[in-house]
């Protein structure tokens, strides 16, 4: 820890931090725009100015940008001195010269960083009476709105989109005093994290179009902490509703999971909840083939009578349903009459994942993934099946830049300087997938193989790491050599795989590689991505009962819990379902 003096008071702050971060952590109000805790400092907005004094005798001091200043022991600063407050007010007045002052109709109104900072510095008079600079807005797709006239050129948007998320179709364009942030031409933003522009932008340049369709101010929304069900990563979210409809989903900061960012599937993928086609009350199928709406009490009584009159009742759970719901169904029908709803290949794959989770190999969270210095991806398109994990992998490739910065004693929060130093130097990322991968642009080695060959590759790498290369094939030898060397050179390697190829051998090979690295005393991690949000939970409840066997046992009544069996099962299973006397479906869709 480091001790600094601010306006005559001593504060103990984190060593190595920049001054702005230290001041904010100490509870002091310092306005800022361009700095972001996940993206570091570039000193673009000049809003975080404070005064630094050379020593105790210095009463004049000099204005410095706190986001670009490292904290040092016994350094003396002032946030409240007149020269600092006057400078900050003049900066925000200059930023507001061309701003449209359209807060009453702006979607950011009431939760706008620019509003907060303007009030904080005390700027309330507008002296400028000239013409404002104006821009034409772009169409950026159905999810994100664009109002360029509100821009204050903080550069957060392009820094996130290009530098952090790896996007290439959003840039800064400038001529004289006109700076424009957008695409080269109208079109849908391609990056799967584009929705974070809404959060990253401190003004209302990028807005949530799905919210704008039925806009509601923040204070009129009822919000609750939730967990995203878009994949199995468990990102933390806030879901907000009004008048019984979901209006928006926002990222909820969780330092060990999703941090500050959320994928677009998680942010914009909840629209199905408001569908008019959802069955929102209990119904009983009549003889005419139509559903008759009944009260929940009557529906429960009807199901109770069905169960009482049945000789054989089975329950089919689901990886979409919660652990509590699956356990309740299991308790209702009995251990021998319950299955978790997975087909055999899914049960086999998730059994492998559970075995790995029970082993002594580390299974890092998404934040921890960013600390690994070499990553091997076997068979899994993580950008599509675990998008937030892919963003963490992209950050992990910058660990070589972190090493270079440490060698030159350059602070990591000096983002532009670190990127300039590293250029294209990246930590090893090796990808073996059946199709092109969105992470190929930062991959050291990227190869396209069939699922069977990917499994063979994994086993060959594990054998080579153990000094037993008998399973090497001529076609894979060069890849095995390259990957083995990179993993051997790494201090902290990570192996990633998943269920998207429906090949259990790929998962076994990934676990085998991780085990081989662990045997050589490497600080090894393994991430095996599950199919659905609660696949691991129901895999832990697995009692080895298969779905086909249970349906073939001639049940009178089948209770299906949040499982879309029609789309997931074979024709034979569908025919078995059609012959069931009593079919009870419990779902939220």
Predicted regions and their residues:
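Ubiquitin-like/PB1-type beta-grasp interaction modules and other compact soluble beta-rich domains
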Residues: 1-2, 11, 35-37
């Amino acid at each position: 820890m480091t001790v600094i003096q601010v306006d005559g008071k001593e504060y103990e702050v984190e060593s190595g931090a920049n001054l702005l971060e230290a001041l904010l952590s100490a509870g002091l109000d310092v306005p800022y725009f361009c700095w972001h805790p996940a993206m570091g400092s570039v000193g673009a907005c000049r809003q975080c100015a404070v005064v630094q004094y050379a020593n105790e005798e210095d009463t004049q001091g000099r204005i410095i940008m706190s986001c670009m200043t490292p904290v040092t022991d016994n350094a003396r600063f002032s946030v409240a001195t007149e020269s600092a407050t006057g400078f900050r007010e003049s900066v925000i007045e200059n930023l507001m010269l061309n701003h449209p002052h359209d807060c009453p109709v702006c979607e950011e109104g009431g939760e706008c960083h620019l509003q907060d900072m303007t009030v904080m510095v005390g700027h309330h008079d507008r002296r400028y009476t000239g013409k404002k600079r104006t821009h034409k807005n772009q169409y950026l797709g159905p999810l994100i709105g664009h109002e360029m006239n509100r821009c204050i050129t903080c550069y957060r948007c392009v820094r996130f989109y290009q530098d952090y998320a790896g996007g290439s179709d959003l840039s800064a364009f400038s001529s004289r005093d006109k700076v424009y942030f957008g695409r080269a031409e109208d079109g849908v933003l391609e990056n799967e994290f584009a929705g974070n522009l809404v959060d990253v932008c401190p003004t209302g340049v990028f807005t949530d179009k799905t919210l704008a369709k039925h806009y509601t101010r923040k204070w009129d929304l009822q919000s609750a902490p939730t967990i995203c069900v878009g994949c199995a990563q468990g990102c933390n979210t806030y879901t907000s509703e009004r008048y019984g409809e979901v209006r928006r989903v926002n990222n909820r900061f969780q330092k060990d999971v999703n941090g500050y960012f959320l994928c677009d599937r998680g942010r914009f993928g909840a629209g199905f909840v408001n569908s008019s086609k959802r069955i929102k009350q209990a119904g009983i199928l009549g003889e005419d083939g139509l559903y008759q709406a009944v009260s929940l009490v009557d529906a429960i009584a009807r199901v109770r009578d069905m169960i009482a009159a049945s000789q054989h009742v089975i329950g089919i759970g689901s990886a979409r349903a919660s652990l509590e719901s699956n356990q309740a169904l299991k308790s209702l029908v009995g251990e021998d009459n319950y299955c978790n709803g997975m087909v055999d290949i899914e049960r086999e794959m998730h059994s492998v994942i559970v075995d790995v989770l029970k082993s002594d190999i580390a299974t890092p969270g998404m934040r921890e993934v960013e600390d690994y210095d070499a990553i091997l991806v076997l068979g899994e398109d993580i950008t599509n099946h675990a998008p937030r994990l892919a963003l963490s992998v992209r950050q992990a490739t910058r660990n070589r830049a972190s090493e270079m910065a440490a060698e030159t004693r350059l602070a990591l929060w000096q983002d532009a300087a670190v990127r300039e130093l590293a250029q294209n130097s990246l930590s090893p990322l090796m990808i073996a997938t059946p199709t092109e991968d969105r992470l190929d642009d930062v991959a050291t080695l990227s190869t396209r193989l069939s699922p069977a060959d990917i499994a063979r590759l994994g086993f060959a790498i594990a054998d080579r790491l153990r000094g037993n290369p008998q399973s090497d094939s001529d076609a894979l030898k060069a890849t095995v050599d390259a990957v083995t060397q990179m993993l051997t050179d790494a201090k902290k390697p990570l192996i990633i795989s998943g269920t998207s190829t429906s090949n259990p051998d790929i998962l076994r090979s990934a676990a085998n590689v991780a085990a081989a690295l662990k045997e050589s005393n490497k600080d090894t991690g393994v991430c095996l991505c599950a199919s659905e949000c609660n696949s691991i939970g129901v895999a832990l409840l697995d009692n080895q009962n298969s779905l086909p066997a249970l349906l073939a046992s001639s049940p009178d009544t089948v209770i299906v819990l949040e499982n879309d069996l029609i789309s997931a099962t074979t024709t034979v299973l569908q025919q078995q379902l059609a012959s069931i006397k009593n079919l009870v479906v419990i779902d939220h869709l």
